[in-house]
Amino acid sequence: MEGPEIQFAEATIDNGRFGTRTVRFETGRLAKQAAGAVLATLDEDTVVLSTTAAGKHPKEQFDFFPLTVDVEERQYAAGKIPGSFFRREGRPSTEAILACRLIDRPLRPLFVKGLRNEVQVVETILAIHPDDSYDVLAINAASASTQISGLPFSGPVGGVRVALIDGTWVGFPRYSEKERAVFDMVVAGRVVGDDVAITMVEAEATDNAWELIKGEGAGAPTEEVVAEGLEAAKPFIRALCEAQAALASRAAKEVQVFPVFPEYEPDAYDAVEQQVADHLDAALRIADKQERESRLDEIKDAAVGALQAGFDGREKELSAAYRALTKKFIRRHILTDSFRIDGRGLKDIRPLTAEVEVLPRVHGSALFERGETQILGVTTLNMLKMEQQLDTLSPVSRKRYMHNYNFPPYSTGETGRVGSPKRREIGHGALAERALVPVLPARDEFPYAIRQVSEALSSNGSTSMGSVCASTLSMLNAGVPLRAPVAGIAMGLVSDEVDGETRYATLTDILGAEDAFGDMDFKVAGTREFVTAIQLDTKLDGIPASVLAGALSQAREARLHILDVMAEAIDTPDEMAATAPRVITVQVPVDKIGEVIGPKGKMINQIQDDTGADISIEDDGTVFIGATDGPSAEAARQAINAIANPHMPEVGERFVGTVVKTTSFGAFVSLTPGKDGLLHISQIRRLVGGKRVENVEDVLGVGQKVQVEIAEIDPRGKLSLHAVVEETPADDAPAEASTATADA
């Protein structure tokens, strides 16, 4: 779009031999009544409209910043009509919810502290190229629209996806290019002086990583390689931030004055500190969470009660001041004494326990505990037709591994709403899913849909990484042949000025309190050989990449220790549970698919009815057969092979066949699907000791089993049968050849 009222700026992402990508930020044409509106375009094909608006009046009753990020996926962006009953977009997809979290996390820390006006950022996907994703473009669009909105925002922030493709970190990779990638990483950051400080990371090894690493010799995404990726993202982030800043210099509104509500005034802090300092310091050395929190609540209640008279109507300030003092003490102990509230050193891990097969009947189960964090993992297997069907803007249309995470309120000893998952639960489930996807067996190697559920039964730090560990154990217990076990650990960071210099302390296996009062939540999952998933959230304006590289190395030590503990519980896949379905495959020629299905599905339905198996056929001729037991699945496979991979019957072969039709001169007997023969009335007499048979129906009825032998095959391939009288027909046996040559 061009016009006198339109301002724009562009950023060029130079990927060398992989070409360039152009990101354009434009404002002045659309959504003019929003406080800030930016149209972001990637290579003129993918278009996202970002708007930022602020409420006119502050929400004084809130003790948090009410920022909301919404992503509106429009199916017309991809030339689609929604598949819902009303043919209209409804509730946001999982991908949209994850994109909301991806945008919220780097933006939230950059607003002025104490802001209580509602701020809403809405991302509308207007057009999308089928080979591109919109989420990273939306991060930049959200930053740009907020930067020009007149809100107190210390941006801009730039976001880029980099993928490690054939040894090169490529910015804004296409889906087709990522098929050759071993690692995919979204990095957000802001320019600080001559450097770029990292504010958010979301990364994972790709679905194809294992094949590329083990089969084609691609480099594994080790901690050192991932650290290189963070550095590789910096020039791209700088270019995006500079383009946003250039747009803001020409189009930004003047920053408005918004009321800021500090959590407490200095006099409240001083009074609380004088009242509780000694008691608080002692309470923070109690290792047990419940006991410690009970004692902290007692101290707070006593302090508020004692000071209430002098701070009438300011009780919230006293509580906030007490929380700030608690934070100060915890951080001071860590930075100066290397002491943590539960008595551990900075690199120590809480006690670990791992157990499998903890539930009856289910296909796989495990219980993983790390300190007071307890996760129950449960695995369910089924046929591939039960995999999740996706109706999204991405080219991915199905998902066979589904990871659901539940965080009930009782896990923290509280009450609350239960039911449909919240955004946090969806995000945690997606993180655990990404950590495990790279080690799943291939579809043809393990043709099952897998649903993994993580139940957070008790929480005191990093239930998402506990879910990764419990899921690995549970899937091995279910018989899933994982390529390697995966474990996860949450790292924390505390930073402050000590003796005139900024000091950083990295914590291994953080508690809930260390997450709340620290500066970073850095989750790392992986195998013994490489990293499979990363998630970084920070409350700072940014963290030096060198600090993150050190945290990655420290996380690896912890991960290896956890994997050792898990291996003591289970280190190889168990036998599949008796309650799990059995799925086998058979390959049929593509031109035989129609014969297997039959007219109007008659043949495949007959096989399913006869054997009790479920059958699904892929376009390439792969047939998946699922049944509650092995014999049923094998019977279905034999029936399919008899149609699609037949052999010519031979004289002398014996079968237990099924009568499918009777006539005045005999009975037609089905030997295998599609292969019938005539048992003449003269042969039927042998079944009754040679007595005369007036009506065939008096001896044989449709559906009855009878053992026969092929007596003759005429030139047209028609079969004449003889009755076998020396053996009793097996009424409940499936139609199958009684000699080895009759097996199909």
UniProtKB/Swiss-Prot annotation:
Residues 581-640 form the KH domain. Pfam families: KH_1, PNPase, RNase_PH, S1. Keywords: Cytoplasm, Magnesium, Metal-binding, Nucleotidyltransferase, RNA-binding, Transferase. GO terms for cellular component: cytosol. PANTHER family: POLYRIBONUCLEOTIDE NUCLEOTIDYLTRANSFERASE, POLYRIBONUCLEOTIDE NUCLEOTIDYLTRANSFERASE 1, MITOCHONDRIAL. Involved in mRNA degradation. Catalyzes the phosphorolysis of single-stranded polyribonucleotides processively in the 3'- to 5'-direction. This is Polyribonucleotide nucleotidyltransferase. The gene is pnp.
